[in-house]
């Protein structure tokens, strides 16, 4: 397990500049996965903007195996928002936008 570390406070602490909690995205990735790379790039960008905090978990890790056992994704990556499945496979930016706007992720 590793937390994405950016120079921005909000990316590592899970708080925006005004100290409001932001949703926590967990990205479960595997090797040689272009969809994982795409999701990582988009979620990293959003973490840098303060929309969310990002934790990247490798499927080979203990935490990754536990997430696979719990959520049984059909394909990778698996994206969780505050511990709840947002989707697997290609990241739906529309679904992510809707979840962030609704405020129902917490």
List each language-model region with its residue ranges.
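Structural micro-motif
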Residues: 71-79
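N-terminal "domain-start" segment that seeds a small globular fold
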Residues: 1-13
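Thiol-based oxidoreductase modules, predominantly thioredoxin-like and allied folds used
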Residues: 52-64
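Local sequence-structure signature of Cys/Sec-based thiol-disulfide redox active-site neighborhoods
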Residues: 10-49
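Generic recognition of short, well-ordered alpha-helical segments
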Residues: 38-41, 66, 91
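Non-catalytic, surface beta->alpha helical segment in thiol-disulfide oxidoreductase systems
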Residues: 80-106
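N-terminal beta-loop-helix "entrance" segment that forms/cooperates
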Residues: 62-72
């Amino acid at each position: 397990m590793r937390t994405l570390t950016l120079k921005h406070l909000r990316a590592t602490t899970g708080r925006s500049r005004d100290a409001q909690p932001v949703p926590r995205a967990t990205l479960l990735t595997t090797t040689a996965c272009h969809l994982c790379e795409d999701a990582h790039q988009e979620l990293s960008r959003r973490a840098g903007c303060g929309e969310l905090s990002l934790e990247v978990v490798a499927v080979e890790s203990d935490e990754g195996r536990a997430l696979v056992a719990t959520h049984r994704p059909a394909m990778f990556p698996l994206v969780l928002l505050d511990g709840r499945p947002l989707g697997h496979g290609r990241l739906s930016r529309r679904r992510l936008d809707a979840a962030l706007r609704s405020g129902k992720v917490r």
